[in-house]
Structure formats: structure tokens, C-alpha cells
């Protein structure tokens, strides 16, 4: 075969004419060191704080330290195969996670990728994990309740929509149990829930997901997981990712509840990252900005006004306020609430529920210490009936604690003191509650009414539990319409008081327990 030189030259000319040169400018750098999930990069001149850096193997790192001649970044995911000399690129984007209703009922990781084996996510777009909290003008005061279903909490330490209420206590005092029951109690309230598990065992999280499914609450909940085996970067970012998912509902005029379990582990992960980035350590080796770590997260939990929602949705949603209620959990060491992270979070939040080991071991569950537990804004959100009936409970318990301390030294007690001690013991017994058994407002109100009006005076201490169970079974059977009315309105007047009195009188006269 003979080659024609003219044809070949024509063919080459055609190819040259068709060739399209596309130049792509990107900021490229080189990894100069890798240590425990933190990489140092040389050459990323235009990198921004918090920017995602593209690594080999379809992974990303987040730039946290911007120095004169290098960038310190944390790797999100496995880092064992990264080595010096590898090329990395800036992306010009900050970290975003998928948000939307399609995430409800799903278990996702920090980056929003599903890990429950139920297929791809159906999301409504992406949202930045770091967002500025709503300003003062965009907020509205807290005046609607979030019912946890616990008598001890809803009566003495009420939580409102848009509030931040800290759950604090030693390990094994029922902190997660309280939070999970609060989620289970939102099945029919319309409040969407987000549960963020930070640094926990995978088996523990699996158990939580199973319990939520058993009680019909998973369909209303997003579970965000950063297990103990995952990198410190993912544990540090998990709460912000969960918060972004909760803000989706808040900004559209809906109510959401988010649980951070727990922020102590997030602070430890952040400390690890900061020390590896050679940031100067402070108290307890935490970096100087550990307060800001939690304040910028918890300030995003708020109740926003109707104008904010209308502006955000461009007029699609009108006349509705939105809220994101946060229940951060902090684990203390030997009951020391004066440690660095606990004091920080106590000062940021609007109150705390303090769970005590001694009470837990004594069989008082939830192990709430009513003396130092407080809700700074929840009182305004309480329903009328709960506010009316719960005042005497706190007083009775305070008097009981004071008298119980003195009665240990006094041999003979007068009748009035003996009655107060007896009443206090019975109220303490009445506030005990089993796990996964949240109570409605009407049920709580009836039980508190019985304690407040002296109906427990002739009931033996050992029979308080069976008295309560029999009373609730009796009203569910014979007085369901009244219970329904109280649940719907939460109101309290002479008529309702008379009906409650009539129920208790007839119950004590005709029933046994």
C-alpha cells in the first residue's frame, strides 16, 4: 500500500483545525507531611478557611490552619494511604450536606451519605454545615412547649420550642435514655427530630435506631452518626451537619428538636485536631476557641419569627414561626460540673437537667436532681394546667430535701414535719418513670393533681406505682373525652378542676390498687 503524502498532510491539517484547547486554572498544592489525619500542604496560595481540598481517591480535607507558607487541613475519611509529594487541589467550596424531608427515617454519616442500606437519599438540595445564627431581630420569644413525656422534667424543668436545655451527668445516669424518650414522645407532635451520635460505639447507635423503630419514632427522625472508630474531623463536624439538617425545618416555619450525644466527645475530637495542628493549648489542653466551638453551634437553635420564615421561603410560607430546640448532652467526671467544657456549655444554654449517680443507683429514674436543675425560659412555654399544678411539686421536694437532712439527727419529729417528710417521699416515688413510657400532658396533670391535693396521704409508699397505674387505666377507660380535651387545650379552670376532683374521688371510692 502506497501512502500519499498530500493526503496525510491534509488529514493532519484537519485534525489541527478541529483540536480544541481548553485551559483549566486550578490551585494545586503538594502534601509535605501526614500525621494522624492532619496533613500539611505547600503551595495552596488562594485557599480559604474551611475550604474543601480535593485529595487523591475521591476524598476531601478541610483547611483549618492558614499559615504563611503552608496550609494545615484535616482529612475526612481514611488517611493511611496518603503520602508526602501527593498533589491536591482547592475546590473553592465549603462543606455542604444534603437536607430535606427525604432524610427523615434515615441513618447518615457526617457528610450526609446514607449508611443504613436503604438506598440513595431523596434530598431537597445542599446546605453549608457552618451557618451564622439568626440575629436578635429575627427571633421570637419562646412560648410553646416541647413535651418530653417525663413528669419530673415537664413539671419542674419545662422545655420550650427554640430553647437550648443541657442534659448533664456522669456516665450511666440515663442521659441518652432521657433524650431518646423525648424523641419517642414527638411521634404525634409534628416536631421533626435529629439525633447526632458523636464518638459512640456502633453497637450502641444500632440499639438506639432499633428502639426508635420499635416505638414508631424513626420515621420522624434523622440519625447522624460519627462513631468512635471514625476520624476526629468527622466527630468534630457531625453536630454542625446535624444542625444544618435541622435548620431546613426551622427556616420553613416548622419545629425541630436536635440532640447532640454528646458534646464532650466533640470537644475531645476538636482538642485532638488542634494539638495536631500545633495550636497553643490552654486549660485542660483544650484550645482557646473551645467556647466558640459550642457557642456558634448552640446559638443556631432558636425560635425565628414569621417575617424571617416568609423572607427565607420568598413568601411561600406566611404567618408561621419556626424553631430548632437543642438538647446537648455533656458527660461529667465524678459529678464535677465545674470542669472547663461543662461550665462553658452551662453558660451558653438556657438551663440544665442534672442527672445524679446517687439518685440513679437509689432507683430514682429519671435521676433528675431538682435542686440544681433549672429551665431559664421554659416556664413561659408551659401549658396552663402544668404551670398551675407543678408549683407545689418543686416546693414539696425542696422542703423534703431540707427536712430529710435534719431528720437524720433528730430522734423525735412533730406531726407536721412527719407529714411533710411523708409527702416528699411519696412525690419522689410518684416522679419515677420507666424508660420508653412517655406520658401525655393529661396523664401527667392527673397524677400531679393527685399529689398536689393530698390524695396520696393514705396510700402506702410501696403502692404509689400501682396506684398511679390503676388511676391511669381507670381514666383511659371511663374518662377519655376529658383527657383528650386537656391534651388538646392544656387549659385549666374551675370546671376542669372539679372534673379532676370528681375522677379522683370516685376512683378512690370504687377502685383498688
UniProtKB/Swiss-Prot annotation:
Residues at the site labelled Required for activity: 373
Protein residues bound to ATP: 169-176
Enzyme Commission number(s) of this protein: 7.1.2.2
Record annotation: effect of changing residue 175 to I: Reduced activity and loss of ATP-binding
GO BP annotation list: proton motive force-driven ATP synthesis; proton motive force-driven plasma membrane ATP synthesis
InterPro entries: ATP_synth_asu-like_sf (IPR023366), ATP_synth_asu_C (IPR000793), ATP_synth_asu_C_sf (IPR038376), ATP_synth_F1_a_nt-bd_dom (IPR033732), ATP_synth_F1_asu (IPR005294), ATPase_a/bsu_AS (IPR020003), ATPase_F1/V1/A1_a/bsu_N (IPR004100), ATPase_F1/V1/A1_a/bsu_N_sf (IPR036121)
Known function: Produces ATP from ADP in the presence of a proton gradient across the membrane. The alpha chain is a regulatory subunit.
UniProt protein name: ATP synthase subunit alpha
Organism: Escherichia coli (strain K12)
